[in-house]
Amino acid sequence: ASSCKDSGRMPENFDYGKVENSVYKNNFFGFELPIPADWVVQDTEQMKKISEEGQKIISEHNEELGEKIKASEVRSAMLLSVFRYKDDSVVGQFNPSFGIAVENLGTFSSIKTPEDYLQQAKSLMLKSGIDYKFPIGFVPVKIGNKNFTVMELTAIYKGNVEVGQMYYCILDKGFAVSIVISFGTDEQREQLRHIISNIRFN
């Protein structure tokens, strides 16, 4: 039988983590992240819906790429997704969020560094047909007690809504681990950066 590293599937001891007392803990990667009590943690079904909506947007612009992203789900997982407000309570403003996603790199021998992974992600985004802009290159940054590499981007969604995102990436245990923050204003960006700065690795 081939190992999970060969297939790119999730290992048997993989831990999706859980939220207890407003703290997300993950034993597989050995970290925890406090979550502000008034923010809204998405459950598994909600995270699946968010992922499907993202795929749909990409497929509308590039059907072949949408299929590739769907096929990659077997080696990818969304560990955490948290929004500032409940979806149905937001009117006239962007609902900021942060999340943690991982991808098993078992089949990607070319990815040796976080920069390699972010470059691949950037290439896929540029093929998506969505109007992405990348104002800066990849920058090293310390989040909590770990050194990450960050990629910043903006995108125009649903006609005229400009959304900013920052992807903070490390490679750990054969996975790319990405913390992603999404924001509509500078104030939201700073609030999100403050939240994720509280992550602690064992």
Positions of predicted regions on the chain:
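Extracellular C-type lectin-like domains
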Residues: 166-168
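Mid-length scaffold segments of soluble, non-membrane domains
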Residues: 99-116, 120-135
